């Protein structure tokens, strides 16, 4: 008799995706982050569900309801901090996952890559609206500053901002709709992730060499299930280290002050995972220019397949491109640091130089370097 996992309509889907899936035999730990992102998403949905049971999306009670969760709800504090720090772990995994895709040329799977970029935008939108919900000072002013950027859009900008706010400023209507968005978006992310996997399984996984691995495939289970479980345990270890020892390490102290429209914090800044984009936004003196640079800094990923001029897919055998890749990583870390600094000398000029370097590496230096490496192969 045929095994039920191969015949049952539902189990067959699970079987083909996680059990009998042919996987390359040489994929490294950098390939673990897809499954870790899935775990992060499940964790965020579960902790978020329990938080939503006690949270109230009203300007008068939002801040107190979060305090109530931490003080009065059984294990509310751990659920709240797992959710807040879980977002940080989510973005760490996300950035590594995207970096892996850039390094090993995974962007040549066009559909998978494009869905991935849409996923990145959706996760960033979810994190942004989620940060507004505790209704602290940084929540309120972050929401005001970032939504205000839309007013830079010619002609319809001001109307668009007021439409999103549901009034003439960030207020009760804004908070209520942001809570609604924050609740629905993770389920959209889950659906997109399934489409992402669907397209990936059409082509099969890439591998570190960038060479087709059809001649050497192994079943996903038990090899990669065990490997993913190890990754998951390490992820949970790091998350719980954050939650139990330094829960506020990545947060902003200003968010422990209730939102006050009459008092602006000295330095308005988003969560750490948006700082690189925020630094690029601030490095351009013009408002519309800054908004375009901000969007371009992420949207540029869509054009990676067009900018790929190398005859090899992966960077593993291309030392010049490797150097550029790691300079890009260092540049992004520099931008993250600058995004958290006040707007004054020397941070302004460092931010501008780092922003120029970011676009220069991706749009100019990487394609040129790849062409040079192609010519070196002929020698």
UniProtKB/Swiss-Prot annotation:
Q: Where are the transmembrane segments?
A: 33-53, 77-98, 113-133, 178-198, 226-246, 288-308, 320-340, 347-367
Q: What broad class describes the main subcellular location of this protein?
A: mitochondrion
Q: How does it sit in the membrane?
A: Multi-pass membrane protein
- Top-rank taxon of the source lineage equals Eukaryota
How many cofactors are bound and how? Binds 2 heme b groups non-covalently.
Q: Does the keyword Mitochondrion apply?
A: yes
Cysteine-cysteine disulfides = none
Q: Where along the chain is heme b b562 bound? A: 83, 182
Keyword set for this entry?
Answer: Electron transport, Heme, Iron, Membrane, Metal-binding, Mitochondrion, Mitochondrion inner membrane, Respiratory chain, Transmembrane, Transmembrane helix, Transport, Ubiquinone
| Task performed by this protein | Component of the ubiquinol-cytochrome c reductase complex (complex III or cytochrome b-c1 complex) that is part of the mitochondrial respiratory chain. The b-c1 complex mediates electron transfer from ubiquinol to cytochrome c. Contributes to the generation of a proton gradient across the mitochondrial membrane that is then used for ATP synthesis.
Protein name as annotated: Cytochrome b
* Gene source species: Muntiacus muntjak (Barking deer)
Q: What is the lineage of its organism?
A: Eukaryota, Metazoa, Chordata, Craniata, Vertebrata
Q: Which gene encodes it?
A: MT-CYB
């Amino acid at each position: 008799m045929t095994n039920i996992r191969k015949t049952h309509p539902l189990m067959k889907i699970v079987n083909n995706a996680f059990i009998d899936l042919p996987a390359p035999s040489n994929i490294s730990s950098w390939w673990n982050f897809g499954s870790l992102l899935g775990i992060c998403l499940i964790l965020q949905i579960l902790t978020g569900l329990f938080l939503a049971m006690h949270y109230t999306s009203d300007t008068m009670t939002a801040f107190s309801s979060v305090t109530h969760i931490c003080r009065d709800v059984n294990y509310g504090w751990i659920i709240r901090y797992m959710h807040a720090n879980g977002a940080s772990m989510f973005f760490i995994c996300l950035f590594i996952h995207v970096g892996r895709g850039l390094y090993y040329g995974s962007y040549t799977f066009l559909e998978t890559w494009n869905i991935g970029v849409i996923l990145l935008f959706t996760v960033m939108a979810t994190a942004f609206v989620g940060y507004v919900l505790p209704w602290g000072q940084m929540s309120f002013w972050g929401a005001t500053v970032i939504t205000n950027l839309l007013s830079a859009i010619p002609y319809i900008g001001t109307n668009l901002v007021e439409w999103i706010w549901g009034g003439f400023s960030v207020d009760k209507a804004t908070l209520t709709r942001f809570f609604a968005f924050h609740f629905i978006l993770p389920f959209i992310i889950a659906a997109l992730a399934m489409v992402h996997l669907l397209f990936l399984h059409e082509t099969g996984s890439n591998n570190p060499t960038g060479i087709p691995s059809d001649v050497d495939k192994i079943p996903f289970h038990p090899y990669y299930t065990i490997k993913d479980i190890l990754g998951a345990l390490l992820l949970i270890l790091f998350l719980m280290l954050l939650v139990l020892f330094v829960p506020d390490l990545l947060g902003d102290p200003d968010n422990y002050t209730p939102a006050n429209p009459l008092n602006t914090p000295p330095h308005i800044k988003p969560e750490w995972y948006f700082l690189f984009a925020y630094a690029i936004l601030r490095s351009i003196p013009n408002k519309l220019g800054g908004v375009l640079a901000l969007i371009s800094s992420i949207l540029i990923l869509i054009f990676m397949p067009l900018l790929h001029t190398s005859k090899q897919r992966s960077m593993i055998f291309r030392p010049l491109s490797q150097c550029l890749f790691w300079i890009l990583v260092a540049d992004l870390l520099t931008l993250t640091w600058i995004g958290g600094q006040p707007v004054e000398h020397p941070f302004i000029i460092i931010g501008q130089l780092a922003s120029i370097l970011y676009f220069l590496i991706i749009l100019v230096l990487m394609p040129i370097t790849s062409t040079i490496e192609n010519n070196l192969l002929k020698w």
